[in-house]
Amino acid sequence: MVEVICATSFLIHLATRKIKNIDSVDTEIGQIQFVVPSAVLNELKKLSKTQKKKQDAITALEFARNLKTTEMSGKFADQAIIERVRKRGGMIATIDNELKNKIKSLGGSVMSFSNDKIVLES
């Protein structure tokens, strides 16, 4: 089973939108497990206190209760994820272009969305 580490942006999108191919992702790329870093949970808790992102953050936090979590500390979630990829490689799920490029430059794999479908980027 491949663990896919979720960035904040991806988790919010996953929790708040209807994803067209969510049930077939396992058959397309093998069995996956979404994993939520503690740094992402902390970021979502902060966002849940802001007016602009409050509802999306709360929805994502509720959604994350059903996912595996992993300890990954850092001042910022993206930085914690980058450090993890730098040390161990892995697959990261994000919709943030800057984070995508950094992960790819470190040799990591990227999962994202296109037209509300989960896709692997090369």
Go through the PLM ranges and name each one.
Residues 39-122:
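Nuclease catalytic cores that cleave nucleic-acid phosphodiester bonds
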